[in-house]
């Protein structure tokens, strides 16, 4: 029976209060109640009796504008925000306890990392003092490495200077790292204690907040939010004042300090635009023919729009991939495991430094303690590697892939911001040329990514705390984690990611998906169906009837994409660069059966297949001494047999090392990859000698690390190192340096002996983000030493016998010069001298991978053929005649032809006719430039923008009011996000997170104030240079570099736009993850809240001292 059909019991009455809410009066007991007395017969008495969403007797669901849905228990006259029907609160408490265990493990691992770093710092300080004493007192002989010195090579002046500079840099770096680690440890420990207190508070007596308590917590959070917003504004003001103060100091442009004056991609992209694109004041300001300028505008705009659309699609794909990864692994679960791997890496560094230290002035007890510590470290590292699980490696692979996707997302958002700026500039220019309409149409039609996040950069929201900030690991930590992952799964590369400076897996290099590359080629260099008519029917700037403008741009050709191919992918069936040297037999063979065509690469001047000069390599198949001359094997064999005899003639092979190099323009880092060492027998090794590689970038500056050593390995036919080292330097300074690579061993008396080496010029290092790896021959110092002894003995014998015997090296050089002259004459007879000119450096030095002379000549012919083809085409284009209307201005005819895209070139045709329109250009009489009759030409905003690609269906009459041809964005009704179940534990976590955020912001503001005081004090003292502490700290460099960008108006808009897009992308990833995840949204949200307290966001360091 329905409750309303039942009569009220005797003595009961129904009434309403002032708010209209129904209550009941019991006249018998003279009491009032919110509970209908008839509910005793219709509602379940307990929760166990409830079916579906029913509430038992005495419970009521209500709504508060501030708190939301809450529940009233009329039986106990209490309120609560948790739904009594859901056991979510109990599940939250269990999850919190589990997370506390993981957080404690991560905290212990990080404390151990701090202790290991402290040991490394003490060891580095001792080593620095020892090297300083050696330098001051000039201990040991300073014989040259080239002369074959062994134990005294430790005191080579250049190497010793590099040792001192590197050790000093390592001391300062370890000090800064310990400061950061101490801050991070303090943050994590405070967060762990906060979570522990919350767990204790909420689990004790099952604490639950009532309505008034929840309202008080929300009011406090609102107050904290206002304080955070004002603090962000103060932080921006401090950054602005810091930028103004910094401008008053001098910056050394020749050192690594040129990081301060960096140009962003927006500036470079704006400079790449024609001056005509930037001048939009009047039509009369445009030089040349109006139709030519307008056509160039149109072609450039179409090209930028296609790139813009492609970048938007790429961002959408990255968001989906990030959402999938985040849904598989919840935040914070990998922290303890990652810290354990970093601890292993730190112990390896400590072990390496212990092995390479020179304990000459140490006591016997200190030396014994050092040896015992080394043995203990070796045992710990071996045990840690044995216990490393496969599941851990897989999870860390996903984390590494996520970091790579985040970096790609950041770069793509910057690209979109740059393209938007260029499109807006072009759109404004075209409006001024054609219709004079107001600028800003791009923002309404193309700002979909930006308009979705138009929040202020200084506004604060508590919900923003738990959005993933999409930050990746520190570069050095990322390198360590990647190498440790690689040890677990050799050659792993996550698919669909880009190669960055933070990736160290040098065995396999990343290659972009061919399907995506082909798709990009079709979308850029092809002629889409939607481009059948781009010219407006009523525009004076139209040079021809409506047709598709064929743009000629180097960015749109196939060659441009070929230049981005990674030639180090060993999975390719046709490898371009893995062509090993075969000096004496079949020990090194080509990995490819046929020669790949290099014409497309040579057209763009790509230097991926050339090798930098090696100055210390006189071995087989290499350059001779400092001459940089290549000699093939078949030419050297007879000469070697003639010059050397006995056991020396058996040494046909030479030791080789594979070195990879890459320069990161963004971070100003030069990466050196030590990959592989081959043919060690040529170094004349002794038994039981352990080898390591010493890398030095010379000359070395005082404030940078420039000398590095790999780990020590036992002798083998092939040694795989796979280690990477970073050098902070500008590109201009790097081109003045030399990379010195030595194979060394450590003697029993702790002296360092160099067995072989090579010097590689860095003058040709390019800005490419792709790693370039090549094989380099090593000069055997022991072999040279033995050879010099042999020559001395022969000379002395000749002097005694009276027979004149020339020096071996002189004979070698004479023979080389004679053979080179013969080769040049032979090449000069087979080619036409007037047309072909030899390149200066790279094209006449083939790769050191066994390519014969004939193959080199064929590649050279391909290069010349491609260049000649382009020059012939340009000449034919310039001399072509086109029929035009007699009133048409033909002043800029050549420029108009340059904006027409030619059809695909065929490399097999050396002389190809240029693409010329065959039909006569007949202009419309209505809109001819010459005034043939009286008419009125009305240009509106629609006509000016009809030159862009229309994404609407064909025009249908009476379908809609035709006011504009511009793309209309569909109106999307904003639907509120699904309301999550909120518990008292959620409220407590939100409150503590807000307090933590505000506390951290306060600390950052205090650091900025302190830095401002230091700069102001230095300015008052009349100092012209920045304080050394600021110049040496990488974090403050990055901060002040971004500060400098915010000062300039254009850069500020560009950076803020990219930052808004990243925030919007983070929220989109958060939303997509909630949709794709198999777990409820409440579980994901609660995990993010817990992880916030143990994942610090350290933006600014504290100010530290610089003293060594």
UniProtKB/Swiss-Prot annotation:
Please give the residue ranges the record annotates as the region Disordered.
434-456, 523-547, 828-861
List localization entries: Nucleus; Cytoplasm, Cytosol
Q: Which residues form a coiled coil?
A: 111-247, 294-329, 360-434, 998-1065
Matches recorded under Pfam families: C2 (PF00168), WW (PF00397)
Highest taxon, organism lineage = Eukaryota
GO CC terms of this entry: cytosol; nucleus
Q: Where is the composition biased (Acidic residues)?
A: 846-861
> Nucleus: is it a keyword of this entry?
yes
Which residue stretches does the UniProt record annotate as biased composition, category Low complexity? 533-542
The family line of this record is: Belongs to the WWC family. KIBRA subfamily.
Q: What is known of its domains?
A: The C2-domain mediates homodimerization.
Stated role: Regulator of the Hippo signaling pathway, also known as the Salvador-Warts-Hippo (SWH) pathway.
Q: What is this protein called?
A: Protein KIBRA
